[in-house]
Amino acid sequence: MIRDRFAHLDWAGWVASPGSRCAPLVLAFRDLEAPNQVLLDERSAAHWALGAAIAAGKPAFAVCTSGTAALNFGPAVAEAFYQQVALLVVTADRPAALIDNGQGQSIRQERIFDDHLVGKGLLNLDQTLDWNAAVVDQALASLKFGPVHLNVPMAEPLYEVVPSRAAGPSGDRPLVVAPLKLELPDLVRHAKRPLLVVGQWNPSWGDAEPAVRELARKGWMIVAEPLSQLPSDAAEQLEDTLELGLPDLDAVVSIGGAWVAKNAKAKLRGCRHWVIGPRDPLPDLFGSVQSRSYAHPYDALKDLADQAPDLGSPWAPRRRSAAASEGWQDMAVHRAIAQKISSDWDLHWGNSTPIRYANFLWGQGLYAPGIRHFGNRGVSGIDGQTSTALGSMWASQRPTLLVTGELSFLYDGGAGLAYDALPALKVVVVNNQGGQIFQWIEGPRASGLLDRNFGFRHRRNVGASAENQGFSYRSAGNIVEFEAAWPSFISDSGPAVLELFTDPDASEKAWKGRFGA
């Protein structure tokens, strides 16, 4: 029954982890016309599925056995919720009578993700087949702009193939209704110096660039980051622009997902704000929201561009000039990478410092137009970055590079523990001997615990972890070694890691001096 319901959807793919209780599900899904991968680690498996859904713009699902295995789906579920990604997690469960009665691999798992879901389905062995079929239909119908949990209790036997029993016809899918025309609130219709913030944007939503350019022509200031999928000449770099100050700003519109620039949010605090998104939460980023609208991001942006009055006085570009940096450090590494990646690539950015270097260099116009930029900026820390990038390339088949830190790569050490061959993902690991970002802020240093409790200063490398996961491995410690290693790394026919060793103190100095004195 479940397999028949799933067969009606166009899946980006599905990922399973080994386990007994999920055996009936795996046996049912094996004939689905969708790519399938098996990963040992459930945390990595869910992030693989997340990456596939993001890259393909179609739902993906992950399957696991009962007990704590299901809890390991949690980080990917939370990321999918805040990044508005159609991720389905299917958790096998034990019959309800066995929960809390001393049985192995049995926990209270029906509601473990409830606060971070857009829908769920709890199957029940005591109900009829048609009742359970309706539960599955309802869960699948809600699989849009966020994660859904399907919990499936299974009684033994688990491995026997039994004749299929047909349930009633599949429930109706939601009707496709023409979107309502967006109505501009007064704060925007009467604004003279409005600002549009374009947050993280999934390419499957549609091309935001034409509407953004039309708004800029009409006199709007547009600010964004590379995760907006906009070319850098279509918008100003969000944080650096706001650092220059916008004294006559009278309205802010935010659309899309999360954005990185923490200081920018503080700069905009108190500004009159209109937030647009497909569902809750529609965040009050500046403590001053005056209007909220529910709409598909692409449709809303088009309507805004069509309806916004022509203000007749475009903003002048507001970009700070970057200072030259010397020597081999993180800034030099990121500049070198930016100049080597062509427009047909997908770039995945690790959290912490990599995405911040990407933001800065995007604002300097260093990335080729057409590159798609991705990162787990919904809510995640360093978890699941390699897994998400692998799942993304697996689904998209586009050349893909992940730029991440050594702690992030080590943390996601289950990413490559797959049964089938890995996609030929390229990973640049910037090894600055710890969590570099904690050197950028004063609190950790003043605590006296910077190296131990915050930065986790170390002398490790990722070579053994990379090779254990099936990546070929190269390393470099200066620009000459980097240039020598790059051609074979980027052209490797399989998955490959290039680890770049940098000095953390020189990297800190270059970052803090990026605009000069």
Q: Can you say where each PLM-predicted feature lies in the sequence?
A:
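Structural signature of the thiamine diphosphate
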Residues: 2-5, 10-13, 55-64, 70-75, ...
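Phosphate/pyrophosphate-binding active-site segments
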Residues: 127, 267-355, 461-465, 470, ...
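Active-site diphosphate/adenylate-binding microenvironment
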Residues: 2-3, 7, 17-28, 316-397
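Glycine-rich, anion-gripping cofactor-binding loops and their flanking helix/strand elements
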Residues: 50, 54, 65-66, 71-72, ...
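Glycine-rich phosphate/diphosphate-binding loops that line cofactor/substrate pockets in enzymes
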Residues: 1-11, 52-57, 81, 139-144, ...
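Glycine-rich, acidic loop regions that bind phosphate or pyrophosphate groups
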Residues: 80, 90-136, 224-318, 419-420, ...
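Thiamine diphosphate
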Residues: 90, 97-110, 362-517
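N-terminal cofactor/phosphate-binding cores enriched in small/glycine residues
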Residues: 1-63, 69-72, 78, 361
